[in-house]
Amino acid sequence: MSGQQTTTHQPWPGVIAAYRDRLPVGDDWTPVTLLEGGTPLIAAPRLSEQTGCTIHLKVEGLNPTGSFKDRGMTMAVTDALARGQRAVLCASTGNTSASAAAYAARAGITCAVLIPQGKIAMGKLAQAVMHGAKIIQIDGNFDDCLELARKMAADFPMISLVNSVNPVRIEGQKTAVFEIVDALGTAPHVHALPVGNAGNITAYWKGYTEYHADGLIDRLPRMLGTQAAGAAPLVLGEPVSHPETIATAIRIGSPASWTSAVEAQQQSKGRFLAATDEEILAAYHLVARAEGVFVEPASAASIAGLLKAIDGGWVARGSTVVCTITGNGLKDPDTALKDMPSVSPVPVDAVAVVEQLGLV
């Protein structure tokens, strides 16, 4: 309309463009991006009321492929393309494969995925297949797959390994911290997150320490990493030969980022906890029904661990806490479908429906 000005809102540009001065990218590199990052930090009022803490959820399941992996993958694939590599390779139980395949498709290069035998969340694998990844099942567990992937990348330089052992993955993943601090204006007292391969706790601690070194925050959080009880090598202090848990994304017996994760825990005066599958599923249902956030089981580990830490007195009432929700619940619909109630028909009658709802 003439005489009126319109307001133009610039879209989120993706994590490389948003934080380029804090990332190891060449001036002439063109980011391979799906506009990842910029995910919401959602207040959790019911969890806050229940615990006496101020809890926020960093909902990384709203990244383009449904998990936090996209932050690191935009960096890894951008780096591979800039170096002239022709393929990316990962060992994955799901989320990494989905992200690697999507970003490889975006870049126009080959993606190969090594998957272990056993339980795989098919929603994640379906994503990789749709993006054209070559899926290879290995007669072994995740750790066997990762060891093979490392060897392949070392022997064939045209292939880039894009698991979190690739340091540029960590660089991309640390940007979630920048967003959290930019939103809160400070660091939380405690940051809770699930721990599988341990790249994320490594990345988050790196982000916090960089902001602190630059004077952008005046405190550092304690890092609270939760592992599944059946896959808790960092809690036990030794590898787990046969990890087992319903939370497939953290079913890892020997984390690739073990050393740096322990450093993050020790330097932050943090803690590793183990949560049983029952505790993880209880948290999975709680966050969905109390806060309206649908998470995959591994993400619920951060909530389960936090509740245990609060009950045990390790997290003081009144603390500000951020929980990282690493993946979307749609990644693993089978777990949710196990709760499907039996459905009985009611008459085509408003009163009958209201009675069924228990409202009268």
From Swiss-Prot:
Modified residues (N6-(pyridoxal phosphate)lysine): K69
Recorded metabolic or biological pathway in which this protein acts: Amino-acid biosynthesis; L-threonine biosynthesis; L-threonine from L-aspartate: step 5/5
Residues binding pyridoxal 5'-phosphate: N95, G196, N197, A198, G199, N200, T326
Any GO BP: L-serine catabolic process
UniProt keyword list: Amino-acid biosynthesis, Lyase, Pyridoxal phosphate, Threonine biosynthesis
Enzyme class: lyase
Pfam families per UniProt: PALP
EC code: 4.2.3.1
Cofactor: pyridoxal 5'-phosphate
InterPro entries on file: Ser/Thr_Dehydratase, Ser/Thr_deHydtase_PyrdxlP-BS, Thr_synthase-like, Thr_Synthase_bac/arc, TrpB-like_PALP, TrpB-like_PALP_sf
Physiological role: Catalyzes the gamma-elimination of phosphate from L-phosphohomoserine and the beta-addition of water to produce L-threonine.
Protein family per UniProt: Belongs to the threonine synthase family.
Name of protein: Threonine synthase
